């Protein structure tokens, strides 16, 4: 997986490379962080729904796994393009501290909604792999800002039933684990979730946490949509250019449209 930072999502659609992008807008308490906005090609008036591509690794992480900021990686750029083509603004950003800066970004969207042309009442989140624990903080009952919906792709969720898979992976790979000690009971019940799973995931923590989360989430009757790519490896949307992978990416875009676009 040495090329994981440059690979693009396996689904290609006409017009992806032509979406409008506003780059390196300042946000954060000291205005020292940057965000990119990918806009739908439709030139209509008014505000758009939006999706935040959540970053769960500290921007100060050393050693740096790549010279690219997460907002410039192949997965992020291509996913933002696909989201924009779906009629939703996609937001990619830089950070220093994952949880605090994600909350700062939410606040910025609410405070600057009009000039950004974003409807702050229709914001979702999407996160993959080790970025998922940070995204989970937004759907906790004590979260200051909550998304309308959330997509968690092949990622670590919560350590439940005494497990330590997520905590161990966070120590190994360096991602934030703000959900340590939390349970499914801490989650809101009104945020629809799409959870995707790679049946052949090479990283045991991912499916171990997903499987426990799904079991307990169903007991608690959470609004979960679950998709399992039985033969998919980790990051199958990058490494498995198959019909199944492309269908799941399309399902992801459909899920976001259904929950964020008022006209659908």
What are these regions (language model features)?
Residues 1-46:
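N-terminal cap/lid segment of alpha/beta-hydrolase-fold proteins
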Residues 65-90:
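Short amphipathic alpha-helix adjacent to the substrate-entry channel of hydrolases
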Residues 104-180:
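Primarily recognizes the serine-hydrolase "nucleophile elbow" in alpha/beta-hydrolase
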Residues 149-150, 155-219:
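The feature captures the conserved acid-bearing segment of alpha/beta-hydrolase catalytic domains
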């Amino acid at each position: 997986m040495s090329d994981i930072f440059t690979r693009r999502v396996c689904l290609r659609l006409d017009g992806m490379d032509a979406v409008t992008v506003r780059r390196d807008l300042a946000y954060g308490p000291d205005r020292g962080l940057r965000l990119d906005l990918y806009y739908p090609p439709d030139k209509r008036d008014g505000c758009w729904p939006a999706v935040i591509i959540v970053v769960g690794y500290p921007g100060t992480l050393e050693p740096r796994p790549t010279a690219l900021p997460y907002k410039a990686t192949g997965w992020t750029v291509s996913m933002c393009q696909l989201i924009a083509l779906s009629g939703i603004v996609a937001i990619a950003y830089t950070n220093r501290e994952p949880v605090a800066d994600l909350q700062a970004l939410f606040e910025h969207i609410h405070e600057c909604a009009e000039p950004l042309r974003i409807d702050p009442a229709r914001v979702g989140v999407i996160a993959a792999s080790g970025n998922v624990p940070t995204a989970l903080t937004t759907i906790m009952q004590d979260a200051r800002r909550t998304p309308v919906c959330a997509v968690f792709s092949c990622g670590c969720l919560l350590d439940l039933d005494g497990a330590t898979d997520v905590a161990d992976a966070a120590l190994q790979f360096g991602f934030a684990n703000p959900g340590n000690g939390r349970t499914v009971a801490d989650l809101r019940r009104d945020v629809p979730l799409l959870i995707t799973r790679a049946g052949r995931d090479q990283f045991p923590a991912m499916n171990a946490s997903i499987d426990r989360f799904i079991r307990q989430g169903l007991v608690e009757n959470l609004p979960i949509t679950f998709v399992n790519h039985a033969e998919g490896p980790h990051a199958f949307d990058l490494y498995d250019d198959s019909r199944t992978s492309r269908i799941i990416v399309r399902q992801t875009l459909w899920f976001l449209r259904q929950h964020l676009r008022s006209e659908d």
